[in-house]
């Protein structure tokens, strides 16, 4: 919209009107006729991103719901010895926990 002096209001800002940039035409007028048919094809075709390929789930694979429904008895079956769950099986020797004795020598110097 173009403002004239007749509708000028002091202190009002100018309104910017957005418009589209001109598009490059790679061919002649045939581009215009083909654009309508290509837009119909684009509706049926996947537009981009990661395509999804749905495959059947193998019989041996557990469903996601199985992990949420496990009772405490069933969860112990997977980890027979929970204290050795992080070991690789190379060092099976049991270690005793030896708590450190408090060091009172530092207290005497202060």
From Swiss-Prot:
Compositionally biased intervals (Low complexity): 28-39
Consult the record and explain the modifications the protein receives after translation: Monoubiquitinated at Lys-15 and Lys-24 during normal S phase, promoting its association with PCNA. Also diubiquitinated at these 2 sites. Following DNA damage, monoubiquitin chains at Lys-15 and Lys-24 are probably extended, leading to disrupt the interaction with PCNA. Polyubiquitinated by the APC/C complex at the mitotic exit, leading to its degradation by the proteasome.
Provide the cross-link position: Glycyl lysine isopeptide (Lys-Gly) (interchain with G-Cter in ubiquitin).
15, 24
| Molecular function terms from GO | chromatin binding; molecular adaptor activity
Provide this UniProt record's keywords sorted from A to Z: Acetylation, Cytoplasm, DNA damage, DNA repair, Isopeptide bond, Nucleus, Phosphoprotein, Ubl conjugation
Q: Motif D-box: list the residue ranges.
A: 23-34
BP GO terms, sorted: centrosome cycle; DNA damage response; DNA replication; regulation of cell cycle; response to UV; translesion synthesis
Q: Where is this motif: Initiation motif?
A: 84-96
Residue numbers carrying N6-acetyllysine: 24
Motif PIP-box extends across 61-71
User: Which residues are modified to Phosphoserine?
Assistant: 28, 71
Please verify whether the record's keywords include Glycosyltransferase: no
GO CC, sorted alphabetically, is: centrosome; nucleus; perinuclear region of cytoplasm
The record places the motif (KEN box) at 77-79
Keyword Nucleus, does the record have it?
yes
Q: Which portions of the chain have biased composition (kind: Basic and acidic residues)? A: 71-80
Q: Where is this region: Disordered?
A: 28-110
Compartment annotation:
Nucleus; Cytoplasm, Perinuclear region
Q: Fill in the subunit field for this protein.
A: Interacts (when monoubiquitinated at Lys-15 and Lys-24) with PCNA. Interacts with isoform 2/p33ING1b of ING1. Interacts with BRCA1.
Q: Domain comment text?
A: The PIP-box mediates the interaction with PCNA.
Described function: PCNA-binding protein that acts as a regulator of DNA repair during DNA replication. Following DNA damage, the interaction with PCNA is disrupted, facilitating the interaction between monoubiquitinated PCNA and the translesion DNA synthesis DNA polymerase eta (POLH) at stalled replisomes, facilitating the bypass of replication-fork-blocking lesions. Also acts as a regulator of centrosome number.
The entry's protein name is PCNA-associated factor
